[in-house]
Amino acid sequence: GGILEFFQLSDDINISSTRYFYSPEVNFSGGSLLPTDQTVYGFSALCATDALLYSVLIADKDPNQFNKICSFDWKGNEIAKYQTDCLVFNLCASDTDTNRLYAIAISQEKGFYLVSFDLE
C-alpha cells in the first residue's frame, strides 16, 4: 500500500495531513504482514529538504520496480513525478542544490552505484 502521513511537531505531535495512494492489501499471519496477489507496493526510500519531500515510488505489484521518484510539498500535495532509467535504492536531496537529486542505484551489472538526477 501507499500512505503518506505528515506530522506537525511542536509541544506534541499532531497529524497535519494524510494522503492515501494505494490501500494496503495484505494478510496478517504470525505477527507479520504478508503480500497478496493484489498487493501494490507504495513508497520506498524517503528524503526531505525544507521545501519538499522526495520518495521512491514503486506503484506496482512487483516490489522490484523502484524506478519512479515523486516529490511532495509539506502538505502532502504531489509536485512532480519522475521516471528514472535505473533502479533507485536510496535518495539524498540538498537545500542548496534544489535542482539536483542524488541517489544510490542498483543493477545486476554494476551492483550499487551513485547517480544524480537533474530536476529542471
In which residue ranges do the predicted regions lie?
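Recurrent small/Gly-Pro-centered beta-turn motifs in extracellular repeat architectures
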Residues: 1, 56-59, 103-107
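Conserved beta-propeller blade repeats
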Residues: 41-46, 87-96
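Beta-propeller blade signature
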Residues: 65-78, 114-120
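Loop/turn-rich, solvent-exposed surfaces of beta-rich toroidal or solenoidal domains
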Residues: 35-72
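Surface-exposed loop and turn segments in beta-propeller and other repeat-based domains
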Residues: 10-38, 86, 95
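Short loop/turn segments immediately following beta-strands, especially the blade-tip
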Residues: 7-19, 79, 117-120
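Blade-level signature of beta-propeller repeat domains, shared across WD40, Kelch, NHL, RCC1
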Residues: 91-120
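Structural signal for beta-propeller blades
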Residues: 2-5, 69, 110-114
